[in-house]
Design a protein with these regions (language model features):
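Specific transmembrane alpha-helix
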Residues: 1-16, 97-113, 126-178, 194-199, ...
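Transmembrane alpha-helical segments and their boundary/interface "anchor" motifs
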Residues: 4, 16-55, 64-74, 103-105, ...
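Transmembrane helix-loop junctions in multipass membrane proteins, especially transporters and channels
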Residues: 17-22, 54-63, 117-121, 139-145, ...
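Membrane-interfacial, low-structure loops and terminal tails that flank and connect transmembrane helices
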Residues: 21-30, 173-181, 243-244, 279-286
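Membrane-interface helix-loop-helix regions
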Residues: 24-33, 39-100, 131-145, 157, ...
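Hydrophobic, aromatic-rich alpha-helical transmembrane segments
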Residues: 28, 32, 36, 67, ...
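Membrane-interfacial entry segments at the cytosolic side of transmembrane helices
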Residues: 117-125, 176-188, 291
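Alpha-helical transmembrane segments of multi-pass integral membrane proteins
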Residues: 159, 186-309
């Protein structure tokens, strides 16, 4: 959820500058072309690897119809709209978030135009879409939140908060004269947000109905993360270096591929019993901390190597 809000902030930034500062309006075709070049090649490559080296050799589908539906919905980035192509898919489990982003990219230039004319009304409608869809799922599909909870409607409020945060940040930079006190306040608020977000996450950790709790708290958590994002952007220079430095810049160059590959590699390593484990119950379910640390480090190292390659 946090990465989706961050994506909303970053992709809306040129539009926010145009709205607030009067800069040239971003060209829609150029935006689509850049976004497609950024995410689709790696995404489709991952689909192909999944299909030809895992799904087809392993005969993962009971019939051709189910296989074709899963392929088509993943190719067109609409798989989360059906529970069988979302929950029961044999494709890489992280790909649904990429599909969510693709839909947002398609909508963003048009939502931005609405923001330019009716900012408050557009933001309010996006929030209401998120609140209403969440309420419908929680009340009409109780116990099936995992099947229906992650879609563009429930995430609409997350995108709205990211876009609002972006506009407020551009306005802050234009109208507010920053000083050591404002930067100190930004730093303190940012650190406080970290503790609050950590507390919120641990509060529902282990809940028997985790998906329902996550869905209920999604919007509130997005407000908190938006505040963290805004305050960090307005914080002191030395504090900002924790997030903006050469290591972070290097990581950004391959972070998308790392995200795409990490789960597939994690599953493959465990299936191949690397690091080695015996018995029928995986060590992550028996509390073997030593194995878990080895496994975690191996996932990071192998995933990073594949992502860079």
């Amino acid at each position: 959820d946090m990465m989706i809000l961050l994506s909303a902030f970053c992709n809306f930034y040129p539009y926010a500058r145009s709205i607030v500062l009067g800069e040239d309006w971003p060209d829609t075709k150029t935006f689509y072309r850049k976004r497609a070049a950024r995410i689709l090649p790696s995404y489709y490559f991952m689909l192909a690897i999944d299909l030809f080296f895992y799904i087809l050799p392993g005969h993962k589908y009971r019939n051709v119809g189910a296989l074709c539906k899963d392929i088509v919905t993943h190719v067109f980035c609409v798989a989360p709209n059906w529970s069988d192509t979302y929950i029961s898919t044999s494709f890489n489990g992280v790909l649904w978030t990429v599909q969510m982003e693709v839909i947002y990219y398609l909508l963003l230039p048009w939502i931005a135009r609405l923001f330019r004319k009716w900012a408050f009304a557009t933001y309010s409608v996006m929030l209401m879409i998120s609140v209403t869809s969440t309420a419908v799922i929680l009340n009409c599909f109780a116990g099936k939140e995992r099947n229906y909870g992650n879609n563009i409607l429930t995430f609409m409020g997350i995108y709205a908060n990211g876009m609002l945060c972006c506009i407020l940040y551009v306005m802050w930079k234009k109208y507010v004269t920053e000083n050591k006190y404002s930067r100190l306040a930004g730093t303190v608020i940012s650190v406080l947000c970290i503790f609050l977000m950590n507390g919120m996450i641990h509060k529902y950790d282990g809940d028997v109905n985790l998906q329902a709790v996550q869905l209920q708290s999604r919007l509130v958590q997005s407000f908190l993360f938006a505040l963290f994002l805004f305050s960090t952007a307005c914080a002191g220079e030395y504090y900002q270096k924790l997030y903006s430095n050469r290591v972070a810049s290097l990581f950004c160059k391959f972070s998308y591929n790392l995200y795409l590959w990490h789960q597939m590699i994690a599953v493959w390593l465990k299936e191949k019993r690397i690091p080695y484990w015996s018995g029928d119950t995986p060590p992550n379910m028996t509390g073997d901390r030593v194995w878990q640390w080895k496994y975690q480090i191996l996932i990071i190292v192998v995933s990073a190597a594949v992502a860079v390659a």
